[in-house]
Amino acid sequence: MESSRSLEHVLSMQGGEDDASYVKNCYGPAARLALSKPMLTTAINSIKLTEGCSSHLKIADLGCAIGDNTFSTVETVVEVLGKKLAVIDGGTEPEMEFEVFFSDLSSNDFNALFRSLDEKVNGSSRKYFAAGVPGSFYKRLFPKGELHVVVTMSALQWLSQVPEKVMEKGSKSWNKGGVWIEGAEKEVVEAYAEQADKDLVEFLKCRKEEIVVGGVLFMLMGGRPSGSVNQIGDPDSSLKHPFTTLMDQAWQDLVDEGLIEEEKRDGFNIPVYFRTTEEIAAAIDRCGGFKIEKTENLIIADHMNGKQEELMKDPDSYGRDRANYAQAGLKPIVQAYLGPDLTHKLFKRYAVRAAADKEILNNCFYHMIAVSAVRV
């Protein structure tokens, strides 16, 4: 994976509807959305709307991916805004119309997204007008002062690129032997942190131009506890996270079996960084134009917590489930790097490793950070 190569054409959640698709494995994001919904509702209620304001409100979901989670988010926003407008209009049905922009990289499965939307509204009245906007949210996507509400859910942990320093063979920042940064050398983590900071500031600068004064920006992203030097908060979760132990072992299996060279393995890095609340606040402060209304740390339980005893009776099914979950988020970029055949072999080995995982009885938790901000 060349660091200079844009990820825009390959980075996406796995499309389609098979067992490894994002649609079939989005229970993790669904849990995150459920936990953040009260805060999202409060954030949307804080928007300043007055009688006689614009005839329609514009909402953007950035990094929308595909599936029911996408629609759940925007439906929450539209529902809350509708109730707020009804109060302003004295309890009558508001005449306000809503326009929703679903935006993600061009590699996203927009066909599946809008096919699902058509099925969802078939036979019922559509609550909003919908449009797709392909492109990176690290760049401008909309005209100046165009949007009233912007949400981005479980997307900002993905970086615009793998840091170039990490790809410099022999340098202190070279991530030799690993495909992510959990447990990596300090210099590797620092390179990722630098890239993550640059990306977040660019994201905020773009949204500052696009959101109207008084508009709302709501961000939910993978995070880590304040003061933690590790990307994953606790040892048990670190061992079971889909990006860590099993992934490294599966790549090493390909090397040990002579299917790829070590250099090939060392050239792949997952472009993800989990920020702290302090890192996020610093970027917002440096960018300007936004006032943070609330920040909240959320701890999400893995969907398999509490089911370990049952799963031990069928370890092969457990292994396939874990491999499918990993593929839902990683298969497109792995396949762009390795090709279909080696990608299939990699995740087969991932499934075998997961089935034999002695950490199966341990619980796993994910840290998320929710931030609501107002454009000032």
From Swiss-Prot:
Expressed, tissue-wise, as follows: Expressed in siliques, developing seeds, anthers and germinating seeds. Not detected in leaves, stems, flowers and roots.
GO biological process terms, alphabetically, are: methylation
Residues given in the record as gibberellin A9 binding sites: W158
Record: residues binding Mg(2+) = N175, V179, R265, D266, F268, N269
Q: Which residues cross the membrane?
A: none
* Domain of life according to the entry: Eukaryota
Q: Which reaction does it catalyse?
A: gibberellin A9 + S-adenosyl-L-methionine = O-methyl gibberellin A9 + S-adenosyl-L-homocysteine
Q: What class of enzyme is it?
A: transferase
Query: Which EC number applies?
Result: 2.1.1.275
| Activity dependence on pH, as recorded | Optimum pH is 7.5.
The Gene Ontology terms for molecular function here are: gibberellin A9 carboxyl methyltransferase activity; gibberellin carboxyl-O-methyltransferase activity; metal ion binding; S-adenosylmethionine-dependent methyltransferase activity
Cofactor binding, per record: Binds 1 Mg(2+) ion per subunit.
Q: What cofactors are annotated for this protein?
A: Mg(2+)
Activity control note: Up-regulated by K(+) and NH(4+), down-regulated by Zn(2+), Cu(2+), Fe(2+) and Fe(3+).
Q: Which UniProt keywords apply?
A: Magnesium, Metal-binding, Methyltransferase, S-adenosyl-L-methionine, Transferase
Identify the residues that bind S-adenosyl-L-homocysteine: Y22, C64, N69, D104, L105, S136, F137
Following inactivation of the gene, the phenotype reported is: No visible phenotype, even in gamt1 and gamt2 double mutants.
Miscellaneous note, as given in the UniProt record, is:
Overexpression of GAMT1 results in dwarf phenotype.
Role: Methylates the carboxyl group of several gibberellins (GAs). Substrate preference is GA9 > GA20 > GA3 > GA4 > GA34 > GA51 > GA1 > GA19 > GA12. No activity with diterpenes abietic acid and ent-kaurenoic acid.
Its family?
Answer: Belongs to the methyltransferase superfamily. Type-7 methyltransferase family. SABATH subfamily.
Name it: Gibberellic acid methyltransferase 1
Native species: Arabidopsis thaliana (Mouse-ear cress)
The lineage, from the top, is: Eukaryota, Viridiplantae, Streptophyta, Embryophyta, Tracheophyta
